[in-house]
A protein has these predicted regions:
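Acidic/His- and Gly-rich active-site-bordering loop/insert found
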Residues: 2-116, 135-140, 312
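An extended, acidic, His-containing surface patch that forms the Zn2+-binding/catalytic region
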Residues: 39, 52, 74-76, 187, ...
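Short glycine/proline-enriched loop/turn "hinge" motifs that connect secondary-structure elements
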Residues: 95, 138, 194-200, 283, ...
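Short, flexible turn/loop "capping" segments at secondary-structure junctions
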Residues: 207, 302-307
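Non-cysteine beta-strand/loop elements that form the S-adenosyl-L-methionine
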Residues: 82, 203-206, 410-416
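Glycine-rich phosphate/pyrophosphate-binding beta-alpha loops
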Residues: 87, 211-214, 396-400
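Fold-level recognition of mixed alpha/beta catalytic cores in primary-metabolism enzymes, strongest
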Residues: 111, 115-117, 121-287, 423-437
Length: 452
């Protein structure tokens, strides 16, 4: 079937696809607590009369993962689309122009609501693409699999991690290419195709002091003062870490983007004028760290015996959580405090450290050897009418599960939406971006899978 025929199907069914997207956005799946089963049931209902087999795997309290399969054949080339059903909570609903679950459409151009950009539009587009391929009767030697997952916003272990281990691997289903639908727009640049991501590590650090009345502070040990000494020396952490080169230098990353905005002078002007682009590019080549939460003390006249901070680290591919932990322990020891691994019974003057949360970094370094990703890039460019570019993400995605486990190195993320809108109040998406993503997902799957 021709490209024009696929486009005609999309054009004829725009209203249907918009209503499907609205139904996903209107389904409460704020995480925490999750409630992703609400979304899974909407997807199942949408697919039930379209010849697409679905399987729902429930867990916990109203949570679930879902698989949709184009057919029953897994012997040839298989393509996997991954999208998460959970969204972050909306914060204060009073700050929203339109209710976060309203899926309000403005001027027939924008759709508003929590999850529009991150990432229910991509998920809807992936589901729509599998229905179009079924409708046109595509002949394949393999399968298109759409995996709608839970838990991405809280690490992904119960979602993509579980699905990979308990469905794909357990059933010996091998996939030759994986596409994760995270938003990849970076205004004012064209669409990016994302090859890798930084890892994250959140460390809880607790200083133990000794309480006393503040009229005699020398009788106690002030845990806040202890923490202030660590904070004061925190920027010295890099001295305690092994020297590792990032997978790409700043100049290499800039060159990746510049090819989409010729001539180079044009890109340099945009780069210098856009602090988000500049800071994001720089962050991709180094460890970034920030102390984001602190608590301590029980009363204004009591010497605090405990102070706690949460420290957020973003690791580039090649760095590990253990490297950061080892370096932080050495730094604290050199300050003069003992690091104790016990969670309780720490003596005054001791520091306790634990991993609060973490996620690995990941990258597909030799992407330029792949003809498949070049074909995908061409489809993106033809659909959007602009040059695309390869890049990395400063934020984490579920792509790491496929790359780092060895399941499928050839994993990228691409989706409708602008990263500025992710987790934002008044999150919104251009409807044309949604329709373009349907075209990209459908055309790529057709080219990748078709035996005609």
């Amino acid at each position: 079937m021709s490209v024009e025929s696929i486009f005609a199907i999309i054009e004829q069914n725009k209203d249907v696809y918009i209503e499907f997207l609205r139904s996903l956005i209107q389904s409460d799946s704020f995480n925490p607590p999750g409630n992703e089963k609400n979304v899974a049931l909407v997807i199942e209902d949408f697919l039930k009369d379209k010849g697409i087999k679905t399987e729902i795997f429930p867990f916990g309290d109203n949570r679930a993962n879902l698989f949709a399969f184009l057919n029953d054949n897994f012997t040839g080339k298989n393509l996997l689309y991954n999208g998460h059903m959970d969204v972050v909570p909306p914060g204060s609903k009073a700050d929203w122009k339109y209710p976060p679950l309203s899926a309000y459409i403005k001027r027939n151009k924008y759709i508003y609501g929590r999850g529009t950009a991150d990432m229910k539009a991509a998920l809807a587009a992936m589901i729509v693409s599998i229905t179009i391929l079924k409708k046109i009767g595509i002949k394949t030697s393999g399968n298109l699999i759409v995996n709608a997952v839970a838990d991405e916003e809280t690490g992904g272990k119960l979602g993509t991690g579980w699905c990979l281990d308990n469905v794909l691997k357990k059933r010996s289903i091998k996939c030759d290419f994986v596409l994760v639908g995270e938003a990849s727009g970076v205004h004012p640049l064209p669409k990016a195709i994302v090859l890798g991501e930084k890892g994250h590590l959140t460390i809880k650090l607790v200083t133990s002091g000794k309480s006393a009345h503040s009229m005699a502070p020398s009788m106690g040990k002030n845990a806040i003062y202890m923490m202030s000494r660590i904070i004061e020396n925190f920027d010295d952490l890099e001295k305690y870490l092994p020297k590792i080169d990032p997978p790409f230098t700043i100049e290499e990353l800039k060159e990746m983007v510049a090819v989409a905005l010729p001539p180079r002078e044009n890109f340099d002007r945009i780069y210098n004028d856009q602090p988000l682009l500049r800071s994001m590019t720089e962050a991709l080549t180094k460890l970034t760290k920030s102390i984001n939460m602190i608590s301590g003390g029980i009363k204004e006249n009591v010497i605090p015996d405990r102070c706690e901070v949460l420290i957020d680290f973003r690791l580039f591919p090649g760095q590990t959580s253990q490297m950061i932990i080892n370096g932080l322990k050495k730094l604290i020891t050199d300050i003069g405090f003992k690091v104790n691994n016990a969670t309780t019974e720490n003596l005054p003057g001791e520091v306790y450290l634990e991993i609060y949360s973490d996620g690995e970094s990941s990258v597909w370094e030799d992407y330029n050897k792949s003809q498949t990703v070049k074909e995908f890039k061409k489809i993106v460019e033809n659909t959007y009418g602009k040059k695309s570019f390869f890049f990395l993400s400063a934020g984490g995605t579920d792509s790491k599960y496929y790359r780092n486990s060895g399941y499928c190195k050839e994993t990228v993320h691409f989706g409708p939406g602008n990263i500025r809108q992710m987790h934002a109040t008044n999150e919104n998406l251009e409807l044309q971006d949604f329709f373009n993503s349907i075209k990209v997902y459908t055309l790529f799957a057709h080219k990748f899978l078709s035996t005609e």
